[in-house]
Structure formats: C-alpha cells, structure tokens
UniProtKB/Swiss-Prot annotation:
Segments of this protein annotated with the region Disordered: 1-39
Record GO biological process: biotin biosynthetic process
Family statement: In the N-terminal section; belongs to the BioW family.
Catalysed reactions, as listed in the record: heptanedioate + ATP + CoA = 6-carboxyhexanoyl-CoA + AMP + diphosphate; 6-carboxyhexanoyl-[ACP] + L-alanine + H(+) = (8S)-8-amino-7-oxononanoate + holo-[ACP] + CO2
Functional description taken from the UniProt entry: Catalyzes both the decarboxylative condensation of pimeloyl-[acyl-carrier protein] and L-alanine to produce 8-amino-7-oxononanoate (AON), [acyl-carrier protein], and carbon dioxide, and the transformation of pimelate into pimeloyl-CoA with concomitant hydrolysis of ATP to AMP.
Gene encoding the protein: bioWF
Source organism per UniProt: Corynebacterium kroppenstedtii (strain DSM 44385 / JCM 11950 / CIP 105744 / CCUG 35717)
Transmembrane regions: none
Annotated residues for binding of substrate: 314, 439, 684
Alphabetical list of InterPro entries matching this protein: Aminotransferase_I/II_large (IPR004839), AON_synthase_class-II (IPR050087), BioW (IPR005499), PyrdxlP-dep_Trfase (IPR015424), PyrdxlP-dep_Trfase_major (IPR015421), PyrdxlP-dep_Trfase_small (IPR015422)
Binding positions (pyridoxal 5'-phosphate): 401-402, 488, 513-516, 564-567
N6-(pyridoxal phosphate)lysine carried by residues: 567
Residue spans of biased composition, Basic and acidic residues class: 24-39
Molecular function (Gene Ontology), one example: 6-carboxyhexanoate-CoA ligase activity
UniProt name for this protein: Biotin biosynthesis bifunctional protein BioWF
Length: 720
C-alpha cells in the first residue's frame, strides 16, 4: 500500500495578470482569480516515508524562488498497489540552443517532423500562457482547445518516479522532493503524458524565472530545449497536442488527472547550469549558499548532518576474518549471506600460496604504470589467462571493475565522427544505449563518455523491443550498447542473444560488464557468453525465451567483455577482454590505464591461479549453482517472495519486502540471530520496493541454507 501526497502553495493577489500585450485572452488567467501559484509537487510513497516527505514538501513551498506563499495545502490519500500503473521513462536528448529564437525554431521543427500541422500556433499559445495551473489541450490538427477552456487547464496528478538508473548508483542519483530537480520532475510528467495514445506532443516552459530550460516531447521522445525563455521571465505553461474523439479526449483527461503512475528509469539530471534551484540543498545534502561554512571540516559536518537527517548515512561494518560462510562481523560470529566471494576462492590455499609467492618474488607494489616500470611478467601472463578463459584474443588489466568500465567507456568516446549531413539537426556523433539498471561504474563511465559529441539513451530494463526502436531511430554514425551481464540487485541476466542480434542489425558496438557472471554462469563458470551458449544446447536451466534462435558462440561475444577478479575469483582487479587491436588501443589511449599504477603482483597472481582453480575444480561452480537453486526453491516453498524476474541461475537472490521499515526490522532480526543479510532500501531501490539481498557461496552447506530459511520464516509474518 502506498500514499499519494500532494502539495500546493499559492499567494493571494488583488488582480490578475494579463497577456504580454496587455490584453485579456482565452489562454490567460481570469480576472476573478484570487491567488497566484507558487509551487506544487507530488509524491507516491510508502507509509514509513509520509512524515519525512510532508516535511520536505513544506520546506519546498516556503523556500521557493517564486515568492512567499500565503497558503500551503498538503493532502495525503491512500493508493492501492493494483491501482498504480508502472511505465518506462521516455528516451532523452538535449538541444543546446543559444537564443530564444533558436529554441523556438527548434521546437517548431520537432513538431513538424512529428506531423503536427499546428506547430506555430501551439508555440504561440504556449508563450501567451500566464498563471494557468494545469495544461492547455489543443487539437494537433485544428489548434482548437479540447479541454474545458477555463483558467484551470488539465492538471496532471498522481505521479512519481523511482529515480533508479542502476542499482549501486541509485543512492547517488536520489533527490528529495525539497530539491525540486526540474529535469527529473519534468521527465516524469512528460512520460506519463506521452503514455496515453491520444497525446501527440507536449510543450513545456517552467514558470520559475531562474529556470530557462524547457522541453518538447513526442512519441516516446523527450527533448530538452535550452534558453527557451529569457532569464528572469515569469512566463511558463504547458500545452498538450492531442488527437481523438470527444470520448477519447475525456478518457485522456481522466487518465492525466486521476491514474496513479510511477515512471521507471529516470536518470541523473544532465550536468548544466539549469538543473537545480539556486540555494537549495542538492542530492548530497548540500547547504544553502548563505549557510556554507568557509572551512572544509565544518562543511563536511553540515553535509553529513543533512545526509543523516534524510536517513541516508551509512556506517561500514568491520570484518575481522576472511569472507567465508562463517566469519566475524563487528566482533560477533556470523553466518555470511552477503559476500561476492561466490566460489570461496579468496581463502583457497592455492590462491593464497600464489599471492604469497608473488609477494616474495616481485615485492608489495610495482612502482609505476604499465607503460613505465609497472609491467611485470605476472601482468602479461594473467592477461593471457583471462583472455583464454573468456574466449577472446586479448585482455587488459585494470585495478578495479569501476576503473575498467570508466576507462573503456571514456576511451570509446574518442575521435567521434560527425553525424552525416542527411541526419537530423543536432544528431550526436555517438549514441550510447544503456540499460536503466546498469551498475554505477557503467553510469559514471557513460557520463565521462558523453562530455563530448556523444549522447546517452536509457532504455527500460531488458526491454529489447524498446532498444530496437531506439536503435532504428538513431542516426549517429557510432553506436554502443552497454549492459550489466548479471544485474547486481535483482540477480537477473541480460538477454545477450537479443542484444547481439540488434547490435549486428544496426551496426552497434556492445560492452557487457560480467562482474557477477564471471565464475558463476555457464557449465565451467566462464560467464554470460558460456551461459547463453549452453542455452542453445539444452532447453533446461537457461533463462531463454521459448523458440528463441541462438547464434553461434562467436556471434554471442560482445566487442568488450569486462570481467572482475574481486567477486567469484576471490582476488581484486578487473580486465577488459576484447580483440588485440582494441586491447592495444586501450593500452595507448585509456587514461585509467596509462596514468594509473599497475595492480600489485600478489593480487594479479591470485587472479591467475583462481582461474586455474575453477578449471581444475569445476565442482565449485556446480555447487554454487546447486546452492543458489536450492535456496530459491526453499524460499518459494515457504511462501517467501522473491523479486519478479530474478533468474534461477545466479547467486544473487533478492527477497521482496516492500516497506523500508520492514526491511530494516527483518535485517536486524537476522543479525540478532547470527546472519548477515543487508536490507536494501530507498534510494538504492525505488520507494516501497525494499529487498533483502541474499547471496550464496559454493562453500555454504545445506544446513546453512536451511537455517536462513527458518530464520526468515520466523521474521516474515506472511511466510508459510
């Protein structure tokens, strides 16, 4: 169960505004109006978030740059889960227009391209709006108003977003209602509006005098338009262009005003000068300019306090033994169900011996980068080992998976070609297509890649139909599809055959981060490529669609496969597996490789021997897979719900809780019983979608798994 919270703030005025030419008009506020809109916002939250959300919305109302309100009204209404419609966010792009005239020309061109014959009329109507709280509905073909033609317009209500573009990045991308991130709110509203089939397009200008970026949206597409109005102008409004019968338009209005919608896949706002209110706290709990301390320590203390007040501060637990099933956490003996040491190789005697020998032979550190004095024999031999293990010609070692993803993505965005002259105006030279639940390291790498002539389009999670449409519409000469192999929160697997088929059809490169698949997927633990290769050889045990045509093994290989040593291999570091020319390109151009000290020989040697151990002891992989399937089956048998869509083949098992307070309570209850299972809640996952994230290891016994199920049955009231 969730609750819809709405805030409206207004100031009383003695007379109404008029149109810019001084005359009263059909598109302006009536002279009978007795108040001026200051601010409005809404959220859909779980019960545990109501009080904090109300406080944030009230703060926003009283600190808005539109002025001091006389009246602030906050309402709370219950919304049943089955009443909520879940939809994906529109695909996004930005037009860097430099003048108001340029912005208006761009809007007109976009509308004409979308088949809107009344583009100029719609834009003129938009620029004449003053004080209308809702949106004006205009017929896309005739320009006539299709709503009730009053001063209120159509109010789009009952909406929110989950603000999740990747599981581990969600916290970084979160923002309270008080911050009013215009881009995220606008994209949420536009996505809801465009979801109704009667809506052809939407135009929007914010009424905030300090915010000059507006947008136009058409069929599945959201385009930010910079400098849509002069700085300081109070002009603002919305126009929806619609087609349909009177009954269809009435249904559209009812949907816009009454249907509860949560939009998924809203990304982090673009980093420009117009993405946030001035003097308001940002997503990290920043302090208004008037309160910022002059010294760093005080600034940090204030920011931490703001972060803690939102319930977002974290404190790392101290582990004092190896990450084995039975370990010591914060001084207590604990049964560990949260480690990525999936195969138990971090404590394998052969792996430890290899690290020890390398430490003695090479020393503790390398003293240089790979291109200076840090390229040891163990580095090159381990790269060959990883390349052979994954079936590639070459591999390039990096210090961490985060570094590997960031360096690879930023490097692929060099020497970007210009779009052909036949492409639409402002087409970027490179477009990156990113799954909405990708890991933070991919998201940050894409941010670095899109600082130049590159853009990103975020597609709904594993939605290959949406991806295909986006690729078909893309005129960029360079395309790149980026996805996790195994998604770190839900434990589901990327549809690699479909991704590769689309990439070949549309001339796109592919990068897959197989951090959680390396050592865990496939009959010998070689990862996602082997997993899907196995799927064509046997019908059982693979998450493939019935009848899906699987290509041969070589066609399953992405251009770049990122593998990490810090999870199933029990060591640290990562590698980008690829062709030899691509590897040499990375060694010469990837800044994370060129300017970083090479990995410690002990870790690299441990990685090499871990791979050999997997090949020598394949039963470890099989035992991990058996444990994962057994625990999933036991949880389901006892009525403990798993997150929809999670795979049976990965060691990541997300247990659905929903309410954030329940997740904290159950996680603490497990801790009291000697288990370590973290509760994952907002902002790492969407509000009201809290989970317990369980991971299995090959070294867990069946008794370990059964004890966890018993504890969960005691703590979860609806389990059997």
């Amino acid at each position: 169960m969730r609750f819809s919270i709405k805030m409206r703030a207004s100031a009383r005025v003695s007379s109404s505004p008029s149109t810019s030419d001084g005359s009263s008009g059909d598109h302006t506020e009536s002279r009978d109006r007795a108040d001026r809109h200051i601010s409005g916002a809404e959220r859909i939250v779980s019960a545990s978030d109501i009080m904090q959300t109300v406080t944030e919305l009230e703060h926003r109302a009283w600190t808005h740059s539109n002025g001091q309100p006389d009246d602030v009204v906050v309402s709370v209404h219950r919304v049943d889960e089955d009443e909520i419609t879940h939809i994906p966010a529109l695909t996004r792009e930005t037009r860097h227009t430099h003048t108001v005239d340029d912005a208006h020309r761009t809007i007109t061109e976009i509308l004409r391209d979308a088949g809107i014959r009344t583009a100029e009329h719609a834009l003129k109507a938009l620029t004449r709006i003053r004080g209308m709280r809702g949106a004006m509905l205009l017929d896309a073909d005739t320009g006539e108003r299709r709503d009730t033609k009053d001063i209120r317009g159509v109010r789009v209500t009952a909406l929110d977003n989950d603000m999740a573009t990747g599981a581990d990045a969600a916290e970084e991308m979160s923002s309270s209602a008080a911050t009013k991130p215009y881009y995220c709110e606008a994209l949420t509203l536009a996505s809801k509006v465009q979801y109704h089939p009667a809506v052809c397009a939407e135009l929007c200008i914010s009424d905030d005098p300090d915010y000059t970026t507006g947008y136009v949206s058409t069929s599945g597409r959201y385009v930010r338009i910079e400098n849509i109005k002069p700085m300081g102008s109070p002009q603002g409004g919305r126009v929806f262009l619609v087609r349909g019968t009177d009954d269809e338009i009435a249904d559209c209005i009812n949907y816009l005003e009454n249907t509860a919608v949560i939009v998924h896949g809203i990304p982090w706002p673009p980093q420009d000068n117009h993405s946030a209110h001035r003097d308001e706290p940002d997503a990290f709990g920043a302090i208004p300019a008037t309160d910022i301390a002059t010294d760093l320590t005080t600034f940090a203390e204030q920011s931490l306090t703001a972060w803690e007040n939102k319930g977002l501060r974290r404190y790392p637990l101290e582990f004092s033994s190896a990450p084995m099933p039975r370990t010591t956490v914060a001084g207590s003996d604990t049964l560990l169900f949260s480690s990525s040491n999936y195969l138990g190789l971090s404590e394998h005697p052969d792996v430890i011996a290899a690290a020890t020998e390398a430490l003695k032979h090479y020393g503790a550190g390398t003293g240089g980068s790979r291109l200076t004095t840090g390229n040891f024999t163990i580095h090159t031999s381990t790269e060959r080992t990883l390349a052979e293990f994954t079936g590639y010609d070459d591999a390039v070692l990096f210090g961490t998976g985060y570094q590997a993803n960031g360096a690879a993505l930023a490097t692929l965005a060099t020497n970007i070609p210009e779009a052909p002259s036949t492409a639409p105006a402002n087409t970027p030279g490179m477009t990156i297509f990113s799954d909405e639940l990708n890991h933070a390291s991919l998201i940050d790498g894409i941010r670095m890649a899109t600082r130049g002539n590159a853009a990103v389009r975020i597609y709904p999670h594993k939605d290959t139909e949406h991806l295909e449409n986006a690729l078909a519409q893309c005129a960029s000469p360079r395309k790149l599809i980026v996805s996790d192999g195994v998604f770190s929160m839900n434990g589901d697997i990327a549809p690699l055959p479909s991704i590769m088929r689309l990439a070949r059809a549309h001339g796109s490169w592919v990068l897959i981060d197989d951090a959680h698949g390396t050592g865990t997927l496939g009959r010998t633990g070689r990862g996602i490529v082997e997993y899907w290769s196995d799927a064509r050889r046997q019908d059982a045990g693979a998450d493939s669609s019935p009848g899906e045509e699987l290509p041969n093994d070589s066609d399953l290989q992405p251009d770049l496969l990122v593998v990490t040593a810090s999870k199933a291999l029990g060591s640290e570091g990562a590698a980008v597996c690829c062709s030899t020319p691509v590897a040499e390109f990375l060694r010469n151009r990837a800044r994370g490789y060129v300017f970083s000290t090479s990995s410690a020989p002990a870790s690299v040697a441990a990685t090499q021997v871990a791979v050999a151990t997997i090949l020598r002891e394949p039963e470890r992989v099989h035992r991990l897979q058996d444990n994962s399937l057994y625990l999933r089956n036991q949880l389901r048998e006892h009525g403990i719900p798993l997150v929809d869509g999670t795979s049976n083949s990965t060691p990541i098992i997300p247990i659905f809780i929903g309410d954030e307070a329940d997740a904290v309570r159950i996680s603490q209850g497990l801790s009291d019983r000697g288990f370590h299972v973290p509760g994952i809640r907002y902002p790492t996952v969407a509000r009201g979608q809290a989970i317990l994230r369980v991971t299995t290891m090959a070294t867990h016994t069946r008794d370990d798994l059964d004890h966890l199920v018993d504890a969960l049955r005691d703590l979860m009231p609806h389990s059997a």
